[in-house]
């Protein structure tokens, strides 16, 4: 890559980091955001037109939970993943107020990790109580196929 492109990429990364860190300590009200859709129980895609351009479209992962994967290792995991996605989308669509808190980058820098509050209720508690997620602290994940 040319030096100019590298400089632009570094400048964009600094801008995104500064803008993101300015939001990280506060609740981010998602009520006017559009296009929210959950891929599975712990990953959602959002469009946030009120944020700076680099942050308007992003993938967010819910902090503190592990849910079955859509690209499952077994039929039971796939079945649970579909239920988790349905649960997540239903909860997000029904909420009048969606707020993100404790925003931070994941370890690869491609997704935002967040706590989500739906009408004041912590989403991860709701999906764990529904039996569609497990608490997760970053360690080794248990298989959903056993």
Please describe what each predicted stretch is.
Residues 2, 6-7, 20-146:
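Small beta-barrel nucleic-acid-binding modules, primarily SNase/OB-fold domains
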Residues 10-19:
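Bacterial N-terminal signal peptides
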């Amino acid at each position: 890559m040319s030096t100019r492109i590298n400089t632009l990429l570094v400048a964009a990364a600094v801008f995104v980091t500064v803008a993101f860190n300015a939001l990280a300590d506060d609740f981010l009200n998602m009520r006017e955001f559009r296009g929210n859709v959950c891929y599975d129980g712990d990953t959602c895609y959002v469009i946030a037109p009120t944020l700076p351009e680099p942050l308007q479209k992003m993938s967010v992962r819910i902090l503190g939970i592990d849910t079955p994967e859509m690209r499952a290792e077994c039929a039971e995991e796939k079945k649970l993943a579909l239920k988790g996605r349905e649960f997540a989308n239903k909860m997000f669509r029904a909420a009048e107020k969606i707020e993100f808190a404790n925003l931070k980058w994941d370890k690869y820098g491609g997704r935002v990790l967040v706590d989500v509050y739906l009408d004041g209720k912590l989403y991860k508690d709701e999906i764990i109580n529904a039996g569609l997620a497990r608490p997760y602290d970053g360690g080794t994940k248990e298989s959903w196929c056993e």
